[in-house]
Amino acid sequence: MPNVAETERSNDSGNGEHKSERKSPEENLQGAVKSFCTSASGAPLGPKGDGHYPWSCPVTHTREKIYAICSDYAFLNQATSIYKTPNPSRSPCLPDSTSLSAGNNSSRYIGIPTSTSEIIYNEENSLENLSNSLGKLPLAWEIDKSEFDGVTTNSKHKSGNAKKQVSKRKTSDKKGRYQKECPQHSPLEDIKQRKVLDLRRWYCISRPQYKTSCGISSLISCWNFLYSTMGAGNLPPITQEEALHILGFQPPFEDIRFGPFTGNTTLMRWFRQINDHFHVKGCSYVLYKPHGKNKTAGETASGALSKLTRGLKDESLAYIYHCQNHYFCPIGFEATPVKANKAFSRGPLSPQEVEYWILIGESSRKHPAIHCKKWADIVTDLNTQNPEYLDIRHLERGLQYRKTKKVGGNLHCIIAFQRLNWQRFGLWNFPFGTIRQESQPPTHAQGIAKSESEDNISKKQHGRLGRSFSASFHQDSAWKKMSSIHERRNSGYQGYSDYDGND
């Protein structure tokens, strides 16, 4: 790096004027100098032989900061020049032994070589510590680059913020595009599909029941859900007593033994009779009955489960489960994942990944209001055959055996009841052939002997039990075809009655 001071000293001795034609690098730097130390403005520089000061003084803090720009090739090691004013006053910042010798026409720039070793300046040190360690060393000024750093930092921040905003915008665009293409799927919807319980079904359970009246109590529970305002209909709800009165029974209802004449076909017939009374439409059928008379041939357990779970989500369907000596109403289900990490999994699970539990509303006050039974246990109950049976309400007893000589068959099943709309046309809407009308009014049913079953009840006695036929809907052959279950009590069961008087 050229010695600027020597060059300027030679020019001053020759003509006493500043260079006008040829500009040195220091003159180009003069416009960049914005402030200087007023305390060192005009003091004479004490000569040390050649007027040069070694670049060995550290950078110190002063009240006024002077700016200097270093050349590219010596930016980290040395400053190019320091602005010097022509004020001849002594600098109070310098030691007493140090003076600035300058003539009237002296140069404004003093070169500073880098011959001696540098003293590293730690910016964390205080000014007092620095003044003690400096001693008599010449003074140098701090090269303040804060404005330049601020500019670069701001530009970096601006560019960084712009990049972040662009990336955020791209991310949001991607998310928006993904949400448009694949709408957000909530796990709650999947849970709702796996855990189904319509509280209206539970509200409609007629509880408690009369002794052995579980059949009519379950039927009224289904009817109220399908047709009354307590469930999914628009009619006033009815009670067991009102239904029994419609069916032709007279009080005291506690004395009626419903067991001997209440069967699957009886419940379906009563359902139609109550519908005729209120001028509403509906149908009933056996959903799943793997064994016995009028079994659902070809229906599998998985197929029945699929229909049952779909039906429990449908407010136009209700169910009655006929188990050991009892009727009650399925009202919901839960598909429980087999693995714990699938508890809140999204999307449907395969049948192999879940096990189904059926929620069953109980009409008897002697049992819990809601049973929760495995579908596998229900299938076991429906698939047992006489003399073997399984009491679904007492699974702790395991498989049991009846005392009977007859082998095979099972009355247990699941019956479906469906509400039909007036706009729907089906077999129920059309009269076929000769219309049969009931000529005898229904009378009290208590005169029937306990030992009589549906096999032995004559048509005349059916009339006394409250059976009636709608003149606008049915003919004998059509009724037999639609009911599909002219199943009789104790048919194929010698010495076995499905009711023992327990509720």
Swiss-Prot record:
Q: Where is the composition biased (Basic residues)?
A: 155-172
Q: What does UniProt give as GO cellular component?
A: cytoplasm; extracellular space; nucleus
Biased segments, Basic and acidic residues type: 1-26, 173-184
Principal location: cytoplasm
Q: In which tissues is it expressed?
A: Widely expressed. Expressed at higher level in spleen, ovary, small intestine, colon, peripheral blood leukocytes and liver. Also expressed in testis, ovary, aorta, appendix, trachea, pituitary gland, bladder, uterus, spinal cord, salivary gland, stomach, mammary gland and bone marrow. Weakly or not expressed in fetal spleen, adult thymus and certain cancer cell lines.
For whether the record's keyword set contains Nucleus, the answer is yes
Q: Which GO terms describe its molecular function?
A: DNA endonuclease activity; single-stranded DNA binding
Which family is it part of? Answer: Belongs to the BIVM family.
Name assigned to this protein? Basic immunoglobulin-like variable motif-containing protein
UniProt lineage:
Eukaryota, Metazoa, Chordata, Craniata, Vertebrata
